[in-house]
Regions:
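Conserved ATP/PPi-binding loop(s) of AMP-dependent carboxylate-activating enzymes
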Residues: 437-495, 516, 532-535, 636-637
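Structural core segment of the AMP-binding/adenylate-forming
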Residues: 4-5, 28, 32-215, 340-341
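Gly/Ser/Thr-rich phosphate-binding loop
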Residues: 190, 195, 203, 207-213, ...
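Conserved AMP-binding/adenylation subdomain of ANL enzymes
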Residues: 34, 260-283, 287-335, 349-351, ...
Length: 681
């Protein structure tokens, strides 16, 4: 099917679908042909999808008419795919148009000034709405008094007309008809079902098989032989890019982490045996979306490569009632279970939800594991007592490719509810404390942390399934030594510590006397919301866009930090520096939330906006984010000697204390309302 559209080795495709079988079919098809794919989570906004399509240089996107989530229809094509392709255009293409048009007008120095102002105001974007550029141009023109009204009007008209002609690089949109919802039809759209039917007909003709029933009646071995003769797998070098998956960084645009055909697949398959002692008779249920690395690694690739059964379930594990995930375990006799801790936190804090779970038999489980976010001993204790006796804790991230810390099932340790996890046999790790840094932030002196001392977790040796690079430098993709954006990859993960090999993910940890590690969240400016990593700079950029859209915006500047949340782990909280001391009203807050939702998706929307008169600022002009976060979590503020304005700390503390008090009242009212109405329903 993919080959029939002219796709070949090295071409890129984007998958934006719910957790359905077609998502897996197309993933496996791309792997077979050496086509490089990038999965995009269905909860992201059209803007985020547009950015990733363009950054990937994709030719084809595969989507669905809709999906289901908590008894609601999620219109993938109408809400995400079509707006991503129609409403957004590549920034560089838009700037090229602007430069060309300016050169056609005899405005020389004024034109160059206009261009620089527009380019600066849109800096950091990958794709933009056409109105973003016209608004930026309008703002720049209002500052240039040398141009008369006629020239200004003609310039803006020419730009608007030319911008309308710019489009994305996508040639075809494959649409999977899943829910049957009506969608808009475009010339670029092709039906997945029609493409598959045509491929079946070509295959039957090639194999001289008259009917579809005859094709389906072939034995597994005969079908494999037939398929391999009809569509041979494309041989690729072991380090050829298999897929890249985007993750948020503390600064800059999201990073497309590249995983390879050889090392990644071999590594994650091996973890199934080492961690779970898996056999081909096991049934594995992973609560994950293919748009995240957990879905790629342990929902799809590792179980299928190992030869065991993977259970796929669309929607929330807690809907229509909290016992849904347990009912799936009972019904399908699941033996291996893997999920983040967020959903279990929601269950254990609600007696009614606990009762829902207890209705089902989960005794077939041999081993379960947490992933994606730090786990507390209390959550692990509940999991061990209520779900599976062997409920272990595993640690890894998108960059790691697969689990790097865990506790091999039935292995060398008596399992305790202490949230500890151990490096796998091929992982060498330590916790470090920085003692001296240079001006660039690189640690030039450090020591290994004492037992129980909190520091930064560092992996000190390479291993096969670690990400190879960051997606980039695509012009050299077919060169023998292609390394993607190697400079950015090295800068992001390998330059924190001076000296020997050191891979730094950006997480705090403690090492115990028994060699086990406990994880304590991020050490950089990334927020982990229910296992979804979001860069604070991404959220800040979306909020600051309000200044471009609304000339009367009250937003002067913004700093976003993560606040602890009982169920989600962390939630974004935005500190706003108001223009001329202005406060935000309800309309402002609603508008800013809507803006972040449309730009970055629902998980990025701050829970609250707190107005302050200034941010904690160092003498070098940098905002001290850690001070804001320390106040939020009632943590020791540490060394504040570098602050230029230490007096602002007390004001911010008072603001946060008022916010906490109001939040407690709101949560109490919400709980009472839930018990009065929702439980009754």
């Amino acid at each position: 099917t993919l080959r029939s559209l002219g796709l070949k080795m090295g071409d890129r495709v984007v998958f934006n679908m719910p957790n359905i079988l077609e998502n897996i079919y197309y993933t496996l098809a791309a792997k077979r042909l050496g086509i490089i794919y990038t999965p995009v989570f269905g909860g992201f906004s059209a803007k985020t999808l547009s950015d990733r399509i363009h950054d990937a240089g994709a030719k084809v996107i595969v989507t669905t008419d809709s999906g289901y989530r908590n008894a609601e229809i999620i219109p993938f094509k109408n809400a995400y795919t079509d707006p991503a392709l129609d409403d957004y255009i590549p920034l560089q293409a838009a700037l090229s148009v602007l430069r060309e048009i300016i050169s056609e007008f005899d405005i020389s120095e004024t034109g160059e000034s206009l261009f620089k102002k527009v380019a600066t105001s849109l800096e950091g974007e990958i794709t933009i709405e056409r109105s973003d550029l016209t608004l930026a141009l309008g703002a720049a023109l209002s500052e240039e008094s040398l141009l008369d009204a006629e020239v200004t009007a003609r310039l803006r008209t020419h730009v608007a007309k030319r911008l309308a002609k710019i489009s994305h690089s996508i040639k075809k949109v494959i649409v999977v008809r899943y829910t049957g919802q009506k969608t808009a039809d475009y010339a670029r759209d092709v039906s997945s079902h029609q493409l598959v039917d045509q491929s079946r007909k070509r295959m039957r003709k090639f194999l001289a098989i008259k009917t579809l029933d005859a094709l389906n009646s072939l034995s597994e071995k005969d079908f494999w032989v037939a398929m391999n003769s009809f569509c041979r797998a494309k041989p690729v070098e072991a380090n050829w890019p298999l897929f890249f998956i985007y993750t948020s960084g503390s600064t800059g645009k999201p990073k497309g982490l590249v995983h390879s055909h050889g090392g990644w697949l071999a590594g994650i398959t091996h973890t199934m045996r080492v961690i779970f002692n898996a056999t081909k008779s096991d049934r594995c249920y992973v609560i994950a979306d293919p748009g995240w690395i957990t879905g790629q690694s342990y929902l799809i690739a590792a179980p299928l490569s190992f030869g065991l059964t993977s259970i796929i379930a669309e929607g929330s594990p807690l809907y229509p009632q909290a016992g849904r995930f347990a009912s799936i375990i009972e019904r399908h006799k699941v033996t291996i279970f893997k999920a983040g801790a967020t959903f279990l936190k929601a269950v254990m804090t609600d007696p009614a939800s606990q009762g829902d779970v207890e209705m089902y038999d989960t005794s077939t489980l041999r081993v379960s594991t947490f992933c994606a976010e730090p786990v507390s001993p209390a959550v692990q204790k509940y999991g061990m007592e209520s779900i599976c006796q062997n409920y272990i804790n595993s640690y890894w991230a998108t960059e790691h490719g697969g689990m790097v810390f865990s506790c091999p099932w039935g292995g060398y340790k008596t399992l305790l509810a202490d949230a500890k996890t151990w490096p796998l046999p091929w992982i060498q790790a330590e916790v470090r404390i920085a003692t001296a840094s240079d001006e660039s932030g690189q640690v030039i002196e450090w020591r290994v942390a004492e037992e129980g001392e909190k520091g930064e977790l560092v992996i000190t040796n390479p291993y096969p399934y670690l990400a190879r690079t960051i997606w980039g430098n695509t012009d050299q993709l077919f060169e023998l030594n292609w390394c993607g954006d190697r400079g950015r990859f090295t800068e992001a993960y390998f330059t924190r510590w001076r000296g020997r090999y050191s891979y730094t993910q950006g997480d705090y940890a403690r090492k115990g006397v028994d060699g086990g590690f406990t994880l304590h969240g991020r050490s950089d400016d990334v927020i982990n919301v229910s296992g979804h990593r979001i860069g604070t700079e991404e959220i800040e950029g979306a909020i600051l866009k309000d200044k471009t859209i609304h000339r009367d915006s009250p937003v002067g500047n913004v700093v976003v930090v993560g606040a602890p949340h009982q169920e989600k782990g962390e939630i974004p909280v935005a500190f706003i520096l108001g223009v001329n001391g202005r406060k935000l009203n309800d309309d402002d807050i609603g508008r800013l939330k809507s803006l972040v939702r449309s730009e970055k998706g629902v998980t990025a929307v701050p829970s609250d906006f707190l107005t302050v008169s200034a941010f904690p600022e160092t003498r070098s002009g940098k905002y001290m984010r850690r001070a804001l976060r320390s106040i939020l979590i009632d943590e020791d503020l540490g060394d504040l000697s570098t602050l230029r304005n230490p007096h602002i700390i007390r004001e911010i503390q008072e603001t946060i204390n008022i916010w906490k008090a109001l939040r407690d009242v709101t949560e109490s009212a919400h709980i009472a309302k839930s018990w009065r109405y929702i439980r009754f329903e």
